[in-house]
Amino acid sequence: MKKQRNLRSMAAQAVEQVVEQGQSLSNILPPLQQKVSDKDKALLQELCFGVLRTLSQLDWLINKLMARPMTGKQRTVHYLIMVGLYQLLYTRIPPHAALAETVEGAIAIKRPQLKGLINGVLRQFQRRQEELLAEFNTRDARYLHPSWLLKRLQKAYPEQWQSIAEANNQRPPMWLRINRTHHSRDSWLALLDEAGMKGFPHADYPDAVRLETPAPVHALPGFEDGWVTVQDASAQGCMTWLAPQNGEHILDLCAAPGGKTTHILEVAPEAQVVAVDIDEQRLSRIYDNLKRLGMKATVKQGDGRYPSQWCGEQQFDRILLDAPCSATGVIRRHPDIKWLRRDRDIPELAQLQSEILDAIWPHLKSGGTLVYATCSVLPEENSLQIKAFLQRTADAELCETGTPEQPGKQNQPGAEEGDGFFYAKLIKK
């Protein structure tokens, strides 16, 4: 039996590591969840994700409720109060229980002398909640985005920025990809129905199913046997444009964790696929996915800017470049992105994308297809990136996705309930 731990203090420390140390929640959270019971894992995740989703609001409230900020060794208390406020605002946890557990969290972080302070701040919020929220809702902070990102969204999408920001703050649906080599989508949906769950097919992507209610993967029919994979609908859209064929040599560049590698092999089981990623640690995820689905691909560690180091002079029939990006299209899945990214990251990422595009293009056969994809909504990484590439690359031609003036296809988060995603299909003349 696992030792009873204070979830509020664990969540506070996790959020502090994200905000103060720039660590990714996807690295921090899983080890913490191993320390708690199964029933507490979901609550711990909800507290971490929820606080990061609403961080700017919680920060603003604390500044209103406290005369001076908590600093130094007491900084964790700041995040513990955030966890308390989040529970009072956004969860069904009874207020008395939320207060009691949050106050007890002070003992777990070795600040028992501050229990009274934490209790006082949270009770003051309860008294002033209506007044404070009315004031907060007149400010830009109500969109729950850092100001630099809000400005970029407003500039890029004068008519849509509010709906994009709102979509980023929602809980994402759970999308699945049905392995067409095992089942048709309809036959798998029948199995799902027999298991007491309901799913809905995507109108455009033939393998995509949205669960009515998110479920643990072990509850999905045939998950361990490779019948189904968790993958957002927009990510599945890459195959629409790549259209892999049996017998072709196909490169999946920046491939980890391998979702698109395995999708290529589901669509074209006899393709020769090379999956490359710069992060050696993440290559294990590609191997895990290939093993679960019973597939084979050549997996290599390599930098997309220097392809000759890992493929020599080899050329490919098709290349999928899922470029490193700001991930501003998947904020609803990874709310820490809002606080890990900085405005200065965008031109740096655009430069990296440009270098990879230029380096990999010679490795595409004449007549071949390259699909450039990102999970970003920012034009600098997407349409402007491809427009510049087309202008400097004489043998590159845009195909089916947009126009030379406005190249590519941009999915916005929430549109068709998929993530924010960009695709551009390029043909080598």
From Swiss-Prot:
Keywords: Cytoplasm, Methyltransferase, RNA-binding, rRNA processing, S-adenosyl-L-methionine, Transferase. It is found in: Cytoplasm. Pfam families: Methyltr_RsmB-F, NusB, RsmF-B_ferredox. It comes from the Bacteria. GO terms for molecular function: RNA binding; rRNA (cytosine-C5-)-methyltransferase activity. Its EC number is 2.1.1.176. One of its GO terms (biological process) is regulation of DNA-templated transcription. S-adenosyl-L-methionine binds at C254, A255, A256, P257, G258, G259, K260, D277, D303, D322. Belongs to the class I-like SAM-binding methyltransferase superfamily. RsmB/NOP family. Specifically methylates the cytosine at position 967 (m5C967) of 16S rRNA. This is Ribosomal RNA small subunit methyltransferase B.
